[in-house]
Regions:
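Short, mixed-charge, low-aromatic patches
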Residues: 26-31, 144, 192-195
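Catalytic cores and adjacent flexible loops of soluble metabolic enzymes
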Residues: 1-122
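Gly/Ser/Thr-rich beta-alpha loop segments that engage phosphate groups in nucleotides
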Residues: 5-7, 11, 139-141, 166
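N-terminal donor/sugar-recognition subdomains of glycan-related enzymes
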Residues: 94-157, 168-172, 184-188, 192-193
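Glycine-rich anion-binding loop/nest that anchors nucleotide
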Residues: 1, 134-141, 164, 232, ...
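Generic structural hydrophobic/aromatic packing signal, biased to beta-strands
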Residues: 20, 72, 134-136, 175, ...
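Alpha-helix termini
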Residues: 18, 22, 150-152, 177
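Acidic/Gly/His-enriched mid-domain segments of enzyme catalytic cores or analogous surface patches
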Residues: 152-159, 165-244
């Protein structure tokens, strides 16, 4: 994929697949190949780039203005499949005449999957009642503050909730998932360690098979006044407030 190999000149599988789809009536799922590129190659591609830019490939694949692709990728909340599905909703002249507000409405419409979370909220409220809670975000700060966190855990015996990642230093009781892109990256680990914790997902994240332990309505957790209305940490704080956590 992406022209990788032991030497230069390898044909990118995704470009071959697109050509076969367009010219020979094949039905290869290119989004799955792009997902593999995004999840496994982009981290080491950026310091030493080669070949074509996936960003422009996605724009060409959807015949749309490249700024649409840039805006969606910069959100860092969407899988490549989701990006292609949103771009597929662009209509008429809007495809090539960039309209940021139009795209934002399509994004929110796509993310806003409606669910009834009454039962799940009731069960979580009971589980969190009277308990201290420790929220862990991704990044280096958890490791830097390891001693302080260990001390807090020892003294308070909190429920530990990891936000869009699985902590290796502190065993979480729950994983809060609001980011579809992170879910794609974590899917294998969640499958392997599924018995060690429960997953609380927002309704914009779709499980590959079956259901998450808890699914909460995405729209009710948005912060309409914030620059990033679906910030994962803010969404989880709203969940904690609804659960009565103090």
């Amino acid at each position: 994929i992406y022209g990788m190999g032991k030497s230069a000149g390898n044909a990118p599988i995704e470009l071959v697949a697109m050509h076969l789809n367009d010219c020979f009536g094949k039905d290869y799922h290119i989004s799955q190949i792009l997902e593999a590129i995004d999840a496994n190659i982009m981290d080491f591609y950026k310091p030493a780039t080669w070949g074509y830019n996936m960003f422009f490939f996605i724009a060409a694949l959807n015949n749309c203005h490249p700024n649409y692709v840039s805006d969606l990728m910069n959100k860092r909340t969407l899988s490549v499949k989701a990006i292609n599905q949103i771009l597929g909703k662009l209509e008429g002249d809007k495809k090539l005449l960039y309209d940021k507000n139009y795209l934002e409405n399509l994004y929110l419409e796509y993310q806003n999957v409606d669910v009834d979370d009454t039962a799940d909220m009731a069960e979580l409220t009971e589980a969190f009642a009277g308990r201290n809670v420790l929220l862990l975000g991704p990044g280096m700060n958890v490791e830097k503050q390891k001693d302080r966190i260990e001390s807090y855990v020892k003294e308070n015996d909190p429920i530990i909730v990891s936000i869009n990642f699985v902590s290796e230093l502190f065993k979480p009781d729950y994983i809060f998932l609001s980011n579809a892109k992170r879910y794609v990256q974590l899917a294998t680990e969640l499958l392997q360690k599924g018995d060690e914790f429960k997953v609380i997902a927002t309704s914009n994240v779709t499980k590959t098979s079956g259901k998450f332990d808890y699914t909460l309505k995405y729209a009710t957790l948005l912060d309409e006044d914030a620059e990033i209305i679906d910030n994962s940490f803010i969404m989880l704080l709203k969940v904690m407030i609804r659960l009565g956590v103090k």
